[in-house]
Swiss-Prot record:
The lineage of its organism: Viruses, Viruses incertae sedis, Naldaviricetes, Lefavirales, Baculoviridae. InterPro entries: AcMNPV_Orf4 (IPR009946). This is Uncharacterized 11.6 kDa protein.
Length: 104
């Protein structure tokens, strides 16, 4: 009888942890991206500033060369490295989705 109770308790605990992880994942990803940007830029640039800078680079490349090498390189990197279940893979898939939606 006790082993059944422990199994049920463990299942409930695991279910609670998974529910917490699922609801907090979006917040975790946002904070992870903010931390990486602040670490790389030494708190001198924000996320919207980096997005505007990337938009400018893509626009200049498209005007000069009729295609964007930076955009193609970033999309290819996300495609090549976005296959998996870790946070890194999920972030790469989210970036890839945003790039395809915005530029293609």
């Amino acid at each position: 009888m006790q082993s059944t109770r422990l199994t049920w308790t463990n299942a409930r605990a695991q279910q609670a942890i998974l529910a917490l992880a699922a609801t907090g994942h979006g917040v975790y990803c946002e904070r992870a991206v903010a931390f990486v940007i602040s670490a790389i830029t030494n708190n001198s640039l924000s996320w919207p500033t980096l997005l505007n800078l990337f938009d400018l680079v893509v626009a200049v490349e498209r005007n000069l060369f009729k295609k964007s090498w930076a955009l193609n390189a970033l999309v290819n990197f996300c495609v090549a490295n976005g296959d998996g279940f870790t946070v890194q893979h999920q972030l790469l898939n989210k970036i890839l989705g945003n790039l395809i939606e915005k530029y293609y």
